[in-house]
């Protein structure tokens, strides 16, 4: 209660033992009842899950060339997601990604406002490109293309209280 926004769907998945539909519905209802918005940052969790499978997900990313060389090095050599990779972690993060998609669907069904966010800077999450990825993932999770676009424009401006000046296309 009394949180205006939860940024990162993982804040909910950390409080779920089963990643169940019932938990997704419960979290959506709790958020709706308390006026809490969601910025799921699906792209960050997808990149994290990919890295538990292989560091090649970053090495082979076409967007890596747009990242500063020092950050590239950190992502490739000091990457705890890749270093701690195991079949159990792969399964855990893959299941978490699917739960986050379910959360978005249930939050939408409950009428909870969803705003786009990316957590740019997480290994593999490249500013700019990641917003495009996030919009696509929001559609995959059940938002319409218009709802996804609104999540990055009008709803974001409403959240900031500046929708009279910006946020419309």
Cite the ranges covered by each PLM segment.
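Functional cores that coordinate and move charged inorganic groups
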Residues: 1-6
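Short, acidic/turn-prone active-site loops that include or flank metal/cofactor-
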Residues: 9-15
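Active-site neighborhoods of metal-dependent hydrolases
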Residues: 15-137, 141
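Surface-exposed patches in mature extracellular/periplasmic domains of secreted proteins
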Residues: 40-41, 116-117, 146-151, 166
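Acidic, glycine-enriched loop/beta-strand segments at the rims
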Residues: 98, 126, 144-149, 157-169
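Buried hydrophobic packing segments
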Residues: 134-135, 153-156
């Amino acid at each position: 209660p009394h949180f205006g926004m939860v940024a990162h769907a993982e804040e909910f998945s950390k409080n779920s033992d089963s990643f169940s539909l019932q938990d997704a519905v419960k979290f959506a209802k709790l958020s709706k009842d308390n006026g809490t918005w969601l910025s799921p940052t699906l792209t960050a969790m997808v990149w994290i899950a990919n890295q538990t499978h292989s560091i090649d997900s970053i090495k082979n990313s076409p967007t890596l060339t747009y990242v500063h060389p020092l950050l590239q090095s950190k992502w490739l050599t000091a990457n705890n997601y890749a270093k701690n990779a195991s079949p159990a972690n792969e399964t855990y993060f893959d299941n978490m990604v699917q739960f986050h998609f379910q959360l978005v669907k249930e939050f939408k069904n409950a009428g909870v406002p969803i705003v786009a966010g990316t957590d740019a800077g997480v290994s593999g999450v490249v500013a700019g490109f990641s917003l495009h990825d996030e919009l696509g993932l929001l559609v995959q999770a059940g938002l319409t293309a218009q709802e996804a676009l609104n999540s990055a424009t009008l709803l974001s401006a409403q959240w900031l209280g500046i929708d009279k000046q910006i946020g419309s296309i």
